[in-house]
UniProtKB/Swiss-Prot annotation:
Species assigned in the record: Mycobacterium sp. (strain KMS)
Protein's name according to its UniProt entry: Large ribosomal subunit protein uL30
GO cellular component, one term: cytosolic large ribosomal subunit
Record's keyword terms, sorted: Ribonucleoprotein, Ribosomal protein
Residue ranges of the TM segments: none
Keyword Ribonucleoprotein: yes
Superkingdom of origin organism: Bacteria
CDD domains referenced in this protein's UniProt entry, alphabetically: Ribosomal_L30 (cd01658)
UniProt family annotation: Belongs to the universal ribosomal protein uL30 family.
PROSITE patterns assigned to the protein according to its UniProt record, in alphabetical order: RIBOSOMAL_L30
Amino acid sequence: MIMAELKIIQVRGTIGARWNQRESLRTLGLRKIRQSVVREDNAQTRGLIKTVHHLVVVEEV
């Protein structure tokens, strides 16, 4: 079975963000604005994205 993948791009900084939002970005592997990562599309990743949806842009790969 082929798992779908998501490309996650950080578009806003973490200044003023809550602690759990910063930790979610770090868990996703994002540290800088315009940095992107590719992750599997699963429930854990979707939950992290939901926490920081206003700081990132998500595309299906």
